[in-house]
């Protein structure tokens, strides 16, 4: 108790004498911080030892692959960590969820076309952070959260329908990244041979057909699209059905390799109805 590992819980019911004191595990004894860098935003969250989010912070901060940017986010992360430690427990470390493929030792971004940071190292990103740091592919981080909260998962394909879609593979109850840290890159599966050009240089990738960015019409936002869709507008329903066909084909293709559960997440997934699934 003096070390903070356990804390007093509720008193037990009396059986005639003084009520006995219960003790319980203190999940806030240690915490960890997750960081997501996006083109126009920096997102931070802190979790406790149960994996529950205990603090959040979002900053409108345009991404720049410069030392000045990494020094600035280092200050933001350190201040956030200090606030977390005041309210909760000591911060064990910081994990950066990366939109890109990492080197086998997870210290360098070897394919970072989305953010324009190929070759960026962990040392550079974390240069001003006062805590141990690591990098992980953002889809892999999401898959690890799935495993944390559902210990019954054995084999699964994770499909994350973000603006830049991604995927991950769970095999034997563990995240399976493969020797090159790039297993589960469903976003670069060819759906339409010779189709739309992808940022990776290929044509017809799943990304170019299953990104929610393909749904809105000119000058329409993604939330705006789904708002009109909910009103039953016919043209939006047709666009949605075509998009769902591509998503379904990607899932079918993936399940032909790994015949396990399918976990669908990401920004677009929150708008899907049971009938869509």
Per-region residue spans from a language model:
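ATP-binding/phosphotransfer module of carbohydrate and carboxylate kinases, centering on a glycine-rich
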Residues: 1-9, 14-18, 22-60, 64-90, ...
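Short glycine-aspartate micro-motif
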Residues: 32-36, 91-95, 156-160, 166
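Short, acidic, Ser/Thr-enriched surface-loop or helix-capping motifs
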Residues: 48, 104, 170
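Hydrophobic "anchor" residues
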Residues: 53, 108-109, 175-176
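Glycine/GP-enriched mid-protein hinge/lid loop-to-helix segment characteristic of carbohydrate kinases
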Residues: 56-58, 65, 123, 127-235
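Glycine-rich phosphate-binding loop and adjoining helix at the ATP-binding site
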Residues: 57-155, 274-277
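Short glycine-rich anion-binding loops that position phosphate/pyrophosphate groups of nucleotides
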Residues: 99-101, 162-164, 268-269
């Amino acid at each position: 108790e003096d070390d903070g590992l356990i804390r007093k819980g509720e008193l037990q019911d009396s059986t005639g004498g003084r009520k006995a004191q219960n003790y319980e595990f203190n999940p806030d004894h240690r915490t960890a911080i997750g960081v997501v860098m996006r083109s126009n935003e920096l997102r931070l969250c802190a979790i406790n030892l149960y994996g529950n989010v205990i603090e959040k912070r979002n900053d409108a901060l345009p991404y720049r692959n410069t030392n000045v940017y990494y020094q600035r986010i280092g200050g933001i992360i350190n201040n956030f960590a200090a606030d977390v430690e005041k309210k909760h427990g000591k911060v064990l470390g910081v994990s950066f969820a990366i939109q890109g493929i990492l080197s086998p030792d997870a210290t360098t971004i070897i394919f970072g076309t989305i953010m324009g940071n190929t070759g960026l190292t962990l040392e550079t990103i974390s240069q001003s952070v006062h805590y141990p740091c690591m990098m992980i592919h953002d889809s892999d981080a999401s898959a690890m959260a799935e495993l944390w909260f559902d210990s019954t998962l054995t084999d699964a394909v994770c499909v994350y329908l973000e603006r830049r879609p991604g995927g991950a593979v769970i095999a034997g109850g563990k995240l399976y990244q493969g020797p090159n840290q790039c297993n589960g890159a469903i976003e670069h599966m060819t759906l339409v041979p010779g189709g739309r050009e992808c940022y990776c240089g290929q044509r017809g990738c799943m990304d170019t057909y299953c990104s929610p960015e393909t749904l809105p019409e000119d000058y329409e936002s993604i939330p705006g699209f789904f708002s009109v869709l909910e009103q039953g507008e016919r043209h939006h329903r047709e666009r949605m059905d075509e998009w769902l066909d591509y998503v379904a084909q990607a899932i079918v293709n993936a399940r032909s390799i790994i015949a396990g559960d399918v976990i669908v997440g990401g920004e677009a997934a929150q708008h899907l109805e049971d009938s869509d699934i």
